[in-house]
Amino acid sequence: GAHRAAARDLLELLLSTGMFGQAVVATDDPAWGETLADLPVVVDLDPSGEPFHFGPRLARLIERYGAKRVLYSGGASAPLLSAERWHEVLTRLGEAERLVVTNNLHSCDWVGFVPALEMVPQIAQETNDNAIAWLMAHGAGLPAVHLPASAGTRFDLDTPLDLLIAHRHPGIGPCLRRFLDELGWVSRQLDQVMVAMAQEGSSLAVVGRVSSAAWAALERATRCWVRVYAEERGMRASGRQGRGEVRSLLADYVELVGVEAFFEELAQLADGVLFDNRVILAARKLWPSAFDRFNSDLYRWDRVEEPFLRHFTRVAAEVPVPVVLGGHSVVAGGLMALAEALEIEQGET
């Protein structure tokens, strides 16, 4: 639901630029495709009975529509990117003969490129969209432009916690806003962390695969004292997680003193905590199901089946300071979105 709402917002925003010759929506959901009948888009349904493979699917679309210049995006990949930024991207793409432009060259959520047909052989080999901008720049030699790190370029909707974060930002589109209003989710922890962020002289702890850009955004937006415990950035992309090589000093400390004592100590150091707990899980060679991880993020600890994560979440819920649990986003794009939302709010008061 949220992804469809965000995709509708993105389509309407991009179409409003008047800079597209053709807009194609590739989906496996014919019912959702029918809801787009009022928009000037072509709905291209995934072939039935075939397993989905990202690279071959995108390559076939480029060939089918004879595209010279392509902007590819997942539906929920840029819920905060402004119309002005999109206009900048499309202008650059329209003026170039050889170019790749993206939000993040190392792990892209959307990418524009020209000449598209020339890129088809490389694209067809890719299993997902994360590496295609890097491939075009370094494998195919296209000149590359990536936008500066910001909430608009680094925040997307990957997890339920991202929906809670998005709901607090005034820049989301009307369809997503309406969906989240109707969803009605609340998070005491996130509300209280936002209060701490707005309070001059409060202390915040940011834990996990902390983005330097997110840390800088937090420093700009607040007048708080910030403790950063950064570990294992790139643990997935480097293959360390897959090989069981993730190491974490905090995970070792949790093992040494126990979960309760760990959180007791953390609560004495900060008035609010943003905690990417995936590093501790990976260091313990745990990777619970998405169901467990997301229920933990929402503090539905009673629905978490993995014993350590269930216990960790329950203890975090009882800490006297707010602890926002999540994945990478909570200390990267999501944190940048919270910082930007706070700046906008303070600018209006």
Residue ranges of predicted features:
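Short glycine- and hydrophobic/aromatic-rich loop-to-beta-strand nucleating segment
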Residues: 108-113
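Conserved alpha/beta core of the MobA/IspD/sugar-nucleotide pyrophosphorylase nucleotidyltransferase superfamily
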Residues: 127-349
